[in-house]
Amino acid sequence: MLGQTVELLSQLLWGRGTIALTLLCGLYFTAGTGFLPLTRLPTVLKRTVGSLFQKRDRKSGGVSPFAAVSTALGGTMGVGNIVGVGAALALGGAGSIFWMWIGAFLGMMTKYAEVLLAVRWRQRDKGAKALRGGPMYYISCGIPNAFGKALAVLFCVFCALASFSSGSMTQTGAIAEALQESFSLPPLLCAAALTLLCGWVLHGGCDRAVRTCSALVPLMSVFYLVGCGVVLLTFRQSIPDALTQIVSGAFSPASAAAGGASGFFVSMRVGIARGIFTHEAGLGSASIAHACSGADSPVEQGFWGIFEVFCDTILVCSVTALAILASEVPLGPSAAQAAFTLVMGPAGGRMLAVAVSLFAFASVISFCLYGQRCIEYLFPNSRLALPLYRLLFLTGCAAGCFAQLPLVFSLADLLNACLLLPNLAALLILSPQVFEATREYFAKGGTRSCSSAR
């Protein structure tokens, strides 16, 4: 009964209106910045990938831009990139991946706007070099009235709740399921180990979360992509057929599992919703991590937001989908594991279980940071709120190991929609600031403009 109710509410909030709003908002920012990901691609690459090989002193303090984007990627590159892609293929057919791509391309500029505003309106902790920011700050400061404050509070409440579903239960449930299937580890042991590890990260605060993600994200990404590369190399002759399925299935009424006249919209809805679950463009949560960056230019940190969506969806999710479709394994949440096992035997299944565990744990680390920032914003003077949140978060991590994944995924989709709507409203209101900052940056020839933390 509970699962049916959550699924019904999720479908209502992820209706045609929400899908259209998400796509139109992304198109608005893409067109308003002159199709920046395409027309300014050399600058974006130079200021992101190219900057990794340059050493610079940051005037604003904080963590490095790469460390910030690693933390954000830790939150976005969770089980949705592996388990979620298989589920999307089962629910929406191969065409759902095409709509995931469309949503990701437009979502790049939505994420860019979020990150730019988060860095522009970030604040410095009193008596410390640490920086904090995110939607609750750019909403309340950028819209300095009762409506803005109410919207900021609403975002924080939904983000804190989402940290229990998307950020803890979904991720730890996937870890427990993967380790039980591949290594026969009981869920109780997984729950105990994850609770201890997450408690260790929580105890270390923002610095420990950022350091852990900076080390974990590049390692887990390469590890997983190598495994997918082996699968694709084995079925390389089937890759063109897989791409054809994705493109043709996007416009076929009977492409989705639902079939019939509603199949087209089901494919689109599943692709957009699952895509947002992975890249989080429009949700605003990842901008909390970007706001910790000591980047002197909000625009340049916004470029890292574009990079984040590309890596998460265009790269990792696409590789997952191609590996599943090319290997022709049964579609579903465990499709990627079936593909790995088909090619590499039991060792492949174990390899994917490790990859799922790494992706999911990185997501847990990032979301515990997001949730804490929201609680600190809601209860700035409370000594009990943060310890209580941490206790509840750890409880959620343990409970996720025993939860039913379909129910948790539906709850995650529901809370994502609750996050999306107030954040998109704020982004549209604050869009003139995004366009002005972008024009000013490129009018100066793409040079850095210092943005002091408040």
Q: What is each stretch, according to the model?
A:
Residues M1-V79, L89-S96, G107, L428-R454:
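N-terminal alpha-helical transmembrane segments of multi-pass membrane transport
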Residues L2, T18, G32-P37, N81-V85, ...:
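Transmembrane helix-loop junctions in multi-pass membrane proteins
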Residues R16-G32, A104-G107, A152-S166, C190-H203, ...:
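Hydrophobic core segments of alpha-helical transmembrane domains in multi-pass membrane transport
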Residues L21-Y28, G32-L45, G173-L179, L185-L194, ...:
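Membrane-interface loop-to-helix entry segments
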Residues F29-T30, G103-K129, M136, S140-G173, ...:
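Helix-loop-helix module between adjacent transmembrane segments
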Residues L36-V63, A87-L89, G93-I97, M109-A146, ...:
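Flexible loop linkers connecting adjacent transmembrane helices
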Residues R56-L91, L117-R120, G127-M136, S140-G142, ...:
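Alpha-helical membrane segments and immediately flanking helix-loop junctions
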Residues E114-K126, C228-Q245, A256-G259, A291-S293, ...:
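Extracellular/periplasmic helix-exit of transmembrane alpha-helices
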